[in-house]
Each structure stands twice: as structure tokens, then as C-alpha cells.
Regions:
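N-terminal, post-signal-peptide region of Sec/Tat-exported proteins
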Residues: 54-85
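Conserved short C-terminal alpha-helix that flanks the catalytic cleft of nucleotide-sugar-dependent
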Residues: 72, 172-173
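An amphipathic alpha-helical core segment
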Residues: 185-215, 219
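Post-cleavage N-terminal segment of exported redox proteins
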Residues: 2-65, 92, 102-167, 193, ...
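Short cysteine/histidine-rich zinc-coordinating motifs and their immediately flanking basic loops
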Residues: 94-101, 196-202
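The canonical Cys-X-X-Cys-His
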Residues: 80-91, 141, 169, 179-191, ...
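Extended intrinsically disordered, low-complexity coil regions enriched in Ser, Thr, Gly, Ala
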Residues: 79-84, 197-200, 266
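Short coil/turn linking the two alpha-helices of tandem helical-hairpin repeats
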Residues: 75-76, 176-178
Length: 268
């Protein structure tokens, strides 16, 4: 056999092996998914919305991701530093980071969300003003970081310091609130898959935040979604950044551990 033909055969064998390995991984992933009763909100959407999320050229949330990339590399504050000045290229250093939030912050002695960590770094390292809650800048940067972990499983820390906060989050999830006297669990555990006001009730796994919601016509945080649910049962929403919301996020992350990150997800 001539060398060119041998090289071509080696390339073909390598390609077949690579494709076969990818197929095997897909089969294993599908088998894992089939045995797990938990489902992402993606599985409850129409085929049209699923297609919108899958295609980055159609996914409107990608506009914020692009803005987040620019913010990551922009020098700001009296320190005249960018996020990249400390962390380098996000594509290399941030993969898997969002999957581990909320995480324990030693300085404050409590858990912080990814958006809170961004603002802590901004104030302490860049010497710049904190972004406002739900601002386009904060959502863009949080979205950009979470996007680096797309396809990675949620991996909440097993830090024992988080346990009392996570336990409080679970109690909040199961506590009846508001004039309608409803809990998160009653909707998202007991009624998941049924329909409410024309939309499917999801299991409430935070796999795609920040998400683009058609209802919002923009990107929004998990805190915004939680506050919206509280208003929906006619309860007084917690303030943005409230410890209760962080504790609830901490529990939700544990409840969804192992499910894949989708950011930016698209929802109705």
C-alpha cells in the first residue's frame, strides 16, 4: 500500500472511531436521561422554541452573550483592569465555573450567586461601581460566563458551610405563601407537566439562566423568575439580592445537580 493511501486509510479509521465515540457518548447520555425523571424546561417547550434555542443564529439571548464578551475584555474602574486581566480568556478559564454557583464566600460568611460574585470582583478588584440588579450589563456578563459552561452538568459544591443555607432554601421551596397559599413544590413537583394559562408547568430546574423569555422580550435572571412566581401567588416578592432568594437558588441548584447547563435558554 502506498503511503498516501495508508495515510488516507488512517484518517478514515480515525474519523470512524471519533464519530463512533461521539455516538456512544450520545447513547450513554440518552440512557442516563431516560432513567432520570427530572426534565429541563426545554423538554416542555414547543418544537419551534426548541429550535430557536438550539440555533445560536436564532437564539436572541446570544445578543447579550456577545455584549458580555466585550465587557469581559474591557478595562474599567480606577484600577483600569478587565476581567480578562485576572482570569485570561473566559473560553479557557471559566468552563465549569457557573456550574458551581451559588458558592460560599468566606469574606461575608454566606453563599453568593454568580451575579453577586461578578459585582464583588468589580468593586474590589476593578474599583468600579457595582452593576445594578437586572441591568443589561450584569445579565450580559453573567450570561457570557454561564455560556462557557453550556453542556456541563450542574455541580453544586459539597461545602458543609452551605448546608444550613441550602436547608433554609428547601424549606422556602416547600412553604405555602401568598394569598393563593401555594408553595413552589405544589406547582413544580406535584403539577409539573400540566398546563397553566396555556403553558406547560416545568419542573423549575435552573439550567438555562440567565434566560431569554418571550414574555419579557429580553434576558432575565433566576431572581427575576422567582420574584415573578411570588407575585403570581400574590405574595410580596423578596428584594433582589435578598438572602432568601440566594438560599432558594442554592437549593434549586442541588435539586438540579447533574442536569446540563443551557445558557442562554429560551422560554415562553
Amino acid at each position: 500500500m502506498t503511503r498516501p493511501r495508508a495515510a488516507m486509510r488512517a484518517r478514515v479509521v480515525g474519523l470512524v472511531f471519533t464519530v463512533g465515540l461521539a455516538g456512544l457518548r450520545a447513547v450513554v447520555w440518552a440512557a442516563e436521561s431516560a432513567s432520570d425523571p427530572r426534565r429541563s424546561g426545554f423538554d416542555f417547550m414547543t418544537p419551534e422554541l426548541q429550535a430557536m434555542q438550539r440555533d445560536d443564529a436564532l437564539n436572541p439571548g446570544m445578543l447579550w452573550i456577545k455584549d458580555g464578551e466585550a465587557l469581559w475584555n474591557r478595562n474599567v474602574g480606577t484600577a483600569d483592569r478587565s476581567c480578562a486581566s485576572c482570569h485570561g480568556a473566559a473560553t479557557a478559564t471559566m468552563r465549569g465555573v457557573a456550574a458551581r454557583y451559588p458558592a460560599f464566600d468566606t469574606a461575608s460568611g454566606r453563599p453568593v450567586t454568580l451575579s453577586q460574585r461578578i459585582n464583588l470582583c468589580r468593586v474590589e478588584r476593578q474599583r468600579a461601581p457595582a452593576f445594578g440588579f437586572e441591568s443589561d450589563e450584569l445579565l450580559a456578563l453573567e450570561g457570557y460566563l454561564a455560556h462557557q459552561s453550556r453542556g456541563q452538568p450542574l455541580a453544586p459544591p459539597s461545602d458543609p458551610r452551605l448546608e444550613p443555607f441550602r436547608a433554609r432554601g428547601e424549606r422556602l421551596f416547600r412553604q405555602r405563601i401568598g394569598q393563593l397559599d401555594f408553595s413552589c413544590a405544589q406547582c413544580h413537583d406535584e403539577q409539573a407537566g400540566k398546563r397553566l394559562a396555556g403553558s406547560a408547568i416545568p419542573q423549575a430546574h435552573p439550567t438555562g439562566y440567565p434566560i431569554y423569555r418571550l414574555e419579557w422580550q429580553g434576558l432575565g435572571s433566576l431572581e427575576r423568575r422567582l420574584r415573578g412566581c411570588m407575585s403570581g401567588v400574590r405574595a410580596e416578592p423578596f428584594a433582589y439580592g435578598a438572602p432568601e432568594l440566594v438560599e432558594l437558588e442554592l437549593y434549586l441548584a442541588q435539586r438540579a445537580a447533574g442536569l446540563r447547563i443551557e445558557t442562554p435558554a429560551v422560554r415562553p
